A protein has these predicted regions:
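Absolute protein N-terminus
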Residues: 1-3
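Short alpha-helical DNA-recognition segment
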Residues: 16-31
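DNA major-groove recognition helix of helix-turn-helix/homeodomain DNA-binding modules
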Residues: 45-60
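Residues within the alpha-helical elements of helix-turn-helix
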Residues: 13, 24, 53
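Short basic helix-loop element that most often maps to the first helix and adjoining turn
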Residues: 5-20
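Short acidic DE-rich linear segments
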Residues: 65-67
Length: 67
């Protein structure tokens, strides 16, 4: 899954600009642009701020292994 693509599609659906997303989430515009392009390495906290604005959440699961 490409989280940047998911965020970009959700942002477009909500009709908010990259600048609006940056402003509402309290992160820099370059962070939003980099994330949507699939570059950069945002922290979990930064991702959470952005996801909150677009109405998404992130869940972590323990990976099942085959023995």
């Amino acid at each position: 899954m490409d989280i940047g693509k998911v965020i970009k599609e959700r942002r477009a659906l909500l009709k908010i600009s990259q600048q609006d997303l940056a402003d509402y989430s309290g992160v820099g515009i370059s962070t939003v642009k980099d994330l949507e392009r699939g570059v950069g390495n945002p922290s979990i906290e930064t991702l959470k701020k952005i996801l909150d604005v677009v109405g998404l959440e992130m869940n972590l699961q323990v990976k099942q292994t085959i023995k």
